[in-house]
Amino acid sequence: MRWMLLWLAMGAGLSPACAVADGYERLDRFFEKVTTFKASFIQVVLDENLLALEETSGLLWIARPGRFRWDYESVHGQSIVADGEVLWLYDVELEQVTRRAQESAIGQTPAVLLSGGQQYRKDYNVTILGRQGAVYWISLVPKLSDGSFAEIQLGFEGETLRLIQLLDELNQITRVTLANVVENEPIPDSVFRFIPPTGVDVISDVE
């Protein structure tokens, strides 16, 4: 129901069911042919009535398999960095870093989906929603939910991922709009290497 409200708020109806094959082609290309991905983003959190609760912006890097970095450039600041083995969460305002084993820390989450993805048909129920304006929408619902989110929708313009919408268990919607997208260009390993700043508290469950 919440997604239905969001679609109504966004405007026109969806394209016919004949677009299903085209939708899978877009998804397969993104997960199988895109090895690196970089973009700037604006993230907006909406409540169940589609009222904006919070807006942040930042930069995103992905290098498959398993590496990603989200840097939030808000006044509070936060970085989420995964190097394939360790996940770092840095809260600038709290001056605190959390260090955890990546495999156990993030489970089945959008970050795992976007930075891996080859198993998406095995792990997710996929629905091709079709075109709305210039954006082609695809829904992925985890087959085994761990409670972190209920549904993720990916919006493509042409073959390029431009929008991510996430519905959590509290019926809040997180909408991420991507810009300045760059695919399949080398990303330095240093982007995914995190060194805690001097003086911050480090909480770790990794040897």
Give the location of each predicted region.
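Flexible, processing/modification-adjacent segments and terminal tails
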Residues: 22-47, 51-53, 81, 90-150, ...
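Beta-strand elements of well-folded, non-transmembrane domains
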Residues: 45, 62-64, 144, 158
